[in-house]
A protein has these predicted regions:
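Short, well-ordered secondary-structure micro-motifs within conserved domains or adaptor modules
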Residues: 218-264
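Short, charged N-terminal beta->alpha structural module
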Residues: 192-221
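Peripheral/terminal regions associated with large enzymatic or DNA-binding modules
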Residues: 1, 30-41, 45, 81-84, ...
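A short, conserved alpha-helix in the catalytic core of glycosyltransferases
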Residues: 39-58, 62-90
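Short, solvent-exposed loop/turn segments at secondary-structure junctions
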Residues: 1, 53, 90-91, 97, ...
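Active-site-adjacent helix/loop segment of glycosyltransferases
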Residues: 36, 78-165
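Acidic/His-rich active-site region of diverse nucleotide-sugar glycosyltransferases
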Residues: 1-56
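Non-catalytic, C-terminal membrane-associated alpha-helical segments of glycosyltransferases
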Residues: 126-193, 259-309
Length: 309
């Protein structure tokens, strides 16, 4: 949709340790500013002063894919230059937003290179918190992929983490990029089999999706024994934090804001064990992350800091 903005600059958040695309999926209008001062812009369309390149160097190639433009923009800002997205300078990207990548390369490179960026640039006093936030995020993805039987995606999560803390850069080994097995077929097959559902909270988008899967399904106005009750939550991994019952029932399913679904006894068992599994994962992996941070600060990053001065 050419009247929608894919993104208009990027912001690096060292509080939550993530990068966000500004104005993503926002309708283009006069309310959008023409100039946006930001941390980075898309490498697909940019102009860079020669002086900035002389100071900050060329765009890093070690990432192979993803996060290279983010790191370059961030480095350029560290050398005192401004990074600005211009509304009059635009290009159109022809892509299907619903297209699913055939393999796990996006998942692998986004995870590995994002981890490397924050291990490299986070302030020393924030590294302990950074390690916990990023490891939690990776483990959550891994756990959800496991629940969705996306075993290749789950293996890609762990491969990206291990390569990040081992200092692996460049193109990934062939055994790290696998076929994408995140199909969402469990969601589809579940609603294909239902005759009636009751939604505790209105969600027109979810209702439309369910009707597309099963045009004959009936949406009840009140809960009843003949209908499956749909309960919405922020995260199916955190439903215990919202006082939802954890006893399995075939007549109740949970769907979170990312449309992940909890609908089986096996899912419920995994949810009950999520927190202790997470704590064991953090205990095992956090020291390795902090060791890699120390290696970066004593190696390549120390040299870059001297260049800044």
């Amino acid at each position: 949709m050419p009247h929608y903005i894919q993104h208009f600059g990027m912001s690096v958040d060292f509080r939550h340790f993530k990068a966000s695309m500004l104005y993503a999926d926002t309708p283009d209008s006069e309310n959008i500013p023409n100039l946006v001062y930001c941390d980075a812009i898309s490498g697909s369309c940019m102009m860079v002063r020669a002086k900035a390149i002389e100071k900050a160097g060329l765009m890093p190639t070690e990432n192979f894919l993803y996060w290279d433009d983010t790191e370059w923009g961030y480095r350029i800002k560290q050398f005192g230059f401004e990074v600005v997205a211009l509304g009059d300078a635009r290009f159109y990207h022809s892509a299907n937003p619903m297209h699913r990548c055939d393999n796990t390369k996006v998942n692998y490179y986004m995870t590995r290179n994002g981890m490397h960026f924050f291990m490299k640039y986070t302030k020393p006093e924030d590294c302990m918190r950074m390690s916990i936030v990023l490891l939690r995020s990776i483990f959550e993805d891994f756990y959800l992929h496991k629940m969705g039987n996306a075993h290749n995606m789950a293996q890609s999560d762990i491969a990206a983490l291990l390569d990040a803390i081992s200092g692996v850069r460049g193109k990934a080994a062939d055994n790290c990029i696998l076929d994408n097995d995140e199909t969402g077929l469990g969601f589809v097959s579940f609603f294909e089999e239902q005759e009636a559902v009751y939604m505790e909270d209105d969600d027109p988008f979810l209702e439309q999706v369910i009707r597309q899967i099963n045009p004959d399904i009936v949406f009840m106005q009140l809960p009843c024994t003949e209908a499956v009750t749909i309960i919405r939550c922020d995260s199916i991994l955190g439903i215990k934090d919202f006082n939802f019952p954890l006893d399995y029932s075939e007549n109740v399913i949970y769907i979170d804001k990312n449309y992940k679904m909890l609908s089986s006894r096996e899912d419920m068992h995994l949810i009950k064990n999520y927190e202790p599994s997470l704590q064991l994962f953090l205990y095992a992996m956090q020291p390795a992350v902090l060791r890699r941070v120390e290696e970066l600060r004593n190696g390549e990053f120390q040299k870059e800091q001297k260049d800044f001065r």
